[in-house]
Amino acid sequence: MSIEIITGPMYSGKTTELIRRITRYKLCKKNCVIISHSIDNRCEEDDNILINHDGFKISHDDFIKTNILINKIKIFDKYEIIGIDECQFFDSNDLMIFCDTLANNGKKIIVAGLNSDFNKNPFKSIIKLIPISEKITKLQSICNFCYNDATFTMKKFNKDIIIEIGGSDLYIPVCRICYNENNTIN
């Protein structure tokens, strides 16, 4: 059917938008599932709960945490709508093949993830999905310094570690000007 991408910096509402879209389909009695990478510590798998950075929770009957997608493709046959949160953590080839295969088999895939790391380098998982996607939504946050629209994520410290799970203690959204002026925070 189709692939939709929701992307942007941290705190731009990607998970909130994913939850909103999935909730709309659930209200229409569509069979939905949400997938999150097993590295994501905002999820409460035992309670089937997905949590955004604001603490908003959605309880979902069908919630799966995994780090590999393609070898589990058969378990998604029963779903019409498949949401994938924190897509930047998944292997880019695995994610691309998974999404393309399911979309070609009549599933709607909604993928949410960061547009880039704190060095403004794009995540391969997003880049590889762009050519095979029907819809791309780029969200913005609010700059922590000047309160203008923010399109980048800046890391406060530990800048030698590219993938590090953290919240506002470690990452902040910033605009281009404030990124360039303040990206020396240690």
From Swiss-Prot:
Keywords: ATP-binding, DNA synthesis, Kinase, Metal-binding, Nucleotide-binding, Transferase, Zinc. Zn(2+) binds at residues 143, 146, 175, 178. ATP binds at residues 8-15. Its EC number is 2.7.1.21. InterPro entries: P-loop_NTPase, Thymidine_kinase, Thymidine_kinase_CS. Substrate binds at residues 118, 162-166. The active site is at residue 86. Pfam families: TK. It catalyses: thymidine + ATP = dTMP + ADP + H(+). GO terms for biological process: DNA biosynthetic process; thymidine metabolic process. One of its GO terms (molecular function) is thymidine kinase activity. It comes from the Viruses. Belongs to the thymidine kinase family. This is Thymidine kinase. It comes from Choristoneura biennis entomopoxvirus. The lineage of its organism: Viruses, Varidnaviria, Bamfordvirae, Nucleocytoviricota, Pokkesviricetes.
